[in-house]
Amino acid sequence: MLFLQFLLLALLLPGGDNADASQEHVSFHVIQIFSFVNQSWARGQGSGWLDELQTHGWDSESGTIIFLHNWSKGNFSNEELSDLELLFRFYLFGLTREIQDHASQDYSKYPFEVQVKAGCELHSGKSPEGFFQVAFNGLDLLSFQNTTWVPSPGCGSLAQSVCHLLNHQYEGVTETVYNLIRSTCPRFLLGLLDAGKMYVHRQVRPEAWLSSRPSLGSGQLLLVCHASGFYPKPVWVTWMRNEQEQLGTKHGDILPNADGTWYLQVILEVASEEPAGLSCRVRHSSLGGQDIILYWGHHFSMNWIALVVIVPLVILIVLVLWFKKHCSYQDIL
């Protein structure tokens, strides 16, 4: 019953009517993390993701789905979503209790975590692919492949015994999981893409600027090119000199901003006398083929230039208006 509850909890969220989608590769998946500190304290967290965009959360206190966007319901009705929330609450309780009952036989296991990633992928021109992966304390434990539960290599006897149990005594669970990740999940994903197409396919231009800081202990200078606020995620940023990419350019991870856009910084370490002639080039689909190029030594962005021009003009206009008003008041007197 433990894994039956677990599978239903993790996978019943996706569902809905069919819709059109034209993505070469796109996925929807649920991530769940169950933390067990001791026999009497446990906490579960859940979230739903469209590729790398979080679309759903789970409120553990109220036992409700959190819809992070106005299109996160996809094609589900409110009644269907209410039924799912009830299932989530019921199975969360049962899952937590059963895990604690098993873990109580060996107190040395506390604290521990169980992590799950389950969902589906759509590839252009191919059949949908479903996946269900379970980890224990961050290490792969088992996965669902085709119609069979498979233990991860080197996972030990625990995963092997669980997989044997699922494969031979819970055929109904296996069939349910197969249908959910191969049929229900793709339908929900297509509905989600249709409902959120304006958001998912939007183009947001990056803001770019340059900065520098000394390199500790080397006497070198670190030149930093920042690109922020862009969407979608794919972006190309690099340091150049005379149209040649500079070796030694270090790219950081592309990180999410709170508004769903992305941020990247690219660093080049140079001698203090070498920055002249360097530039940073930013290429993104939102720019329509017109790359942003920032030259070191001339690195006021257009926003800053506009600010430098506009602020004095605003001050001048305010002074003129105040002077006219003051003069008119004096004339009346």
Swiss-Prot record:
Membrane-traversing stretches: 303-323
Annotated tissue distribution: Expressed on cortical thymocytes, on certain T-cell leukemias, and in various other tissues.
Domain of life: Eukaryota
Cytoplasmic side: 324-333
Entry's localization field: Cell membrane; Endosome membrane; Lysosome
BP GO annotations: adaptive immune response; antigen processing and presentation, endogenous lipid antigen via MHC class Ib; antigen processing and presentation, exogenous lipid antigen via MHC class Ib; immune response; positive regulation of T cell mediated cytotoxicity; T cell activation involved in immune response
Subunit structure and binding partners: Heterodimer with B2M (beta-2-microglobulin).
Keyword terms of this UniProt record: Adaptive immunity, Cell membrane, Disulfide bond, Endosome, Glycoprotein, Immunity, Immunoglobulin domain, Lipid-binding, Lysosome, Membrane, Signal, Transmembrane, Transmembrane helix
Bilayer disposition of the protein: Single-pass type I membrane protein
Cellular component annotations (GO), alphabetically ordered: endoplasmic reticulum; endosome membrane; external side of plasma membrane; extracellular space; Golgi apparatus; intracellular membrane-bounded organelle; lysosome; plasma membrane
Record-given protein name: T-cell surface glycoprotein CD1c
Domain Ig-like: 206-296
InterPro entries: Ig-like_dom, Ig-like_dom_sf, Ig-like_fold, Ig_C1-set, MHC_class-I_related, MHC_I-like_Ag-recog, MHC_I-like_Ag-recog_sf, MHC_I/II-like_Ag-recog
Role description: Antigen-presenting protein that binds self and non-self lipid and glycolipid antigens and presents them to T-cell receptors on natural killer T-cells.
SUPFAM superfamilies for this protein: Immunoglobulin, MHC antigen-recognition domain
GO molecular function: endogenous lipid antigen binding; exogenous lipid antigen binding; glycolipid binding; lipopeptide binding
Topology, Extracellular side: 18-302
Glycosylation sites: N38, N70, N75, N146
Note: During protein synthesis and maturation, CD1 family members bind endogenous lipids that are replaced by lipid or glycolipid antigens when the proteins are internalized and pass through endosomes or lysosomes, before trafficking back to the cell surface.
